[in-house]
Regions:
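Aromatic (tryptophan-biased) beta-strands that constitute blades/sheets of beta-rich domains
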Residues: 22-37, 77-80
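Short beta-strand elements that form the blades of beta-propeller/WD-repeat-like
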Residues: 2-15, 47-60
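Acidic, proline/glycine-rich low-complexity IDRs
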Residues: 61-83
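Residue-level detector of beta-strand structural context in well-folded domains
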Residues: 10-11, 40, 67
Length: 83
């Protein structure tokens, strides 16, 4: 699965549950981002750079959470439960 970060133009490539690759618009490798500790990647959500991650345990009553991707910094931020 692929998604273009609307802020940076970087390409996010999701391969399996543990591989998020960041590529330049020309396809050159920029960095890899690991899933947050205790989570695995599932799929992209919505139109932006947001991923659903599945948790090993519940947090605030939810296992699946949406994480916003900062492709330029190589970070993920938990933003909301995934429905």
């Amino acid at each position: 699965m692929r998604r273009v970060d609307p802020v940076t133009g970087l390409v996010l490539v999701l391969e399996g549950e543990g591989n998020l690759h960041v590529r330049s618009p020309r396809g050159e490798p920029v960095r890899d981002i690991a899933p947050p500790e205790g989570f695995s990647f599932s799929h992209f959500a919505g139109p932006g750079a947001v991923l659903v991650c599945r948790g090993e345990r519940e947090i605030e009553g939810w296992r699946d959470w949406q994480f916003e991707v900062d492709a330029a910094a190589g970070t993920l931020r938990r933003v909301a439960p995934a429905w």
